[in-house]
Amino acid sequence: EPSLGLAPLVVKGIFEIIQEINKQGVTVLLIEQNANMALKIADLGYVLETGRITLTGSGRDLLKNEDVKKAYLGT
């Protein structure tokens, strides 16, 4: 969870670095509670509840999912 406890400006920088690493051809496995930021940069995402995968899909698809919005994105 690279953004845990960090100021928003620092979080933005961390995610920019993660994206740059990925653009260089490196696969990144990211475990992150900040679902909004993580899904924005994810090619593929998993939603876990009580240790089980409940949803999977592209980051974009998961951001649009109504259940994900309600439970994790505060909308």
What kind of feature is each model-predicted range?
Residues E1-T75:
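Glycine-rich phosphate-binding loops of nucleotide-dependent enzymes
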